[in-house]
Amino acid sequence: MRIILLPQPHWLIGKEGRSEVESGEQRRTVFAILLAISFSHFLNDMMQSVIPSIYPLIKEKYGFTFGQIGAITFAFQMTSSVLQPFVGWYADRRPQPYSLSVGMLFTLLGIVLLSFANSFLLILLSVSVIGWGSSVFHPSASRVAQMAAGNRNGLAQSIFQVGGNGGSAIGPLLAAILVLPFGQHAIAWFALAAMLASATLFRVGVWYKRELHRFTKKAQVVNSRVAQFSHRKINIALALLVVLVFSKAFYMSSMTSYFTFFLIDKFGVTVRVSQLCLFAFLTAVAIGTVVGGHLGDRYGRKYIIWGSILGAAPFTLLLPYLNFPLTILTAIVIGLVISSAFSAILVYATELKPGRVGMVAGLFFGLSFGLGGIGSAFFGWLADHTSIEFIFHVSTLLPLLGVVAGFLPNIEPKRKVR
């Protein structure tokens, strides 16, 4: 029997004949996997965005208060957020390549339950099950994105996240077309998206299983980037990132959960028009995500984080005082600017804790979801006791916390990717 040794692909061979996967040098970005993960993220977040999109419908149908609306968001975002760091930690230690596909089945179940839920408690249960699916998806998918990134981590995370942002943007539009005219039962059609996502993620799992050993070697090499930092300095940097995630997540919760109500209350627009305006805002968020990741790779993530959150502050402060056309235009600018932060934050954090991509991604996705849920519940309570317009006078101050990004250490002050 003859054994034929096939040569390695040229992009894996270094200048001295070594595998560049082993040496940690240039690696190819696997765009096919990134696009598959991004597409799955698109479908996942499209289904999740149905939840806030139907708030006006279920508020009127069941007579819910703003506090109950906030509690629904809180239930979804807390179930997804609390589990994510643990799922990520487990994925780092014992990777399960097909967990992504299986986790999507939780989302499928939650969507079907939500389409038939006829009480506050059943709706809470439905969104919680969707949250469980999210807790499995985000940390593991973020880990796959880093595996496929090559040396372009910021771009890879942006491609992954833009799928989610695109899904969040298209979800309200589809809800306006399918759910609002035909009622709550029409939500069941979104189960088809869960089936497609599960099938796509199964194929990703095949690649994931094959590439695990290479990713482990890459993580060991990347660890040298932050070897100069003490544990105290790393922990302070992570704490600053948490503050930045808090400011972004709380502000975004006011927009995603209550921007439609704000437009209806202040300008008297219809529910359909308000959903289209939310779609415009979320589309801007999707575009800003890609731009932010690319710029972070080129010029350094610290500066993108700083400019993204603090740079949105002048526009958020103006928002409550403008007329309808300028309100929509300003909301689009806010979406473009503030959304460029998260991919930079996530990659910055994983560079501080290399080899723990799943745990770090789970922690920061979990924080983003959990703080968003707390913010939504808080602003719902505040709206019940004051007014929907008042919460937008309060939330506009949050991006000012972006000033703390100036205290982050410079990991890569300036970096260009050609």
Protein language model annotation of sequence segments:
Residues 82-121:
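Conserved MFS/SLC helix-loop-helix module at the cytosolic interface between two early adjacent transmembrane helices
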Residues 51-52, 235-286:
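Extracytoplasmic gate region of multi-pass secondary transporters
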Residues 126-163:
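Cytoplasmic helix-loop-helix junction between adjacent transmembrane helices
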Residues 296-345:
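C-terminal transmembrane helical hairpin of 12-TM major facilitator-type secondary transporters
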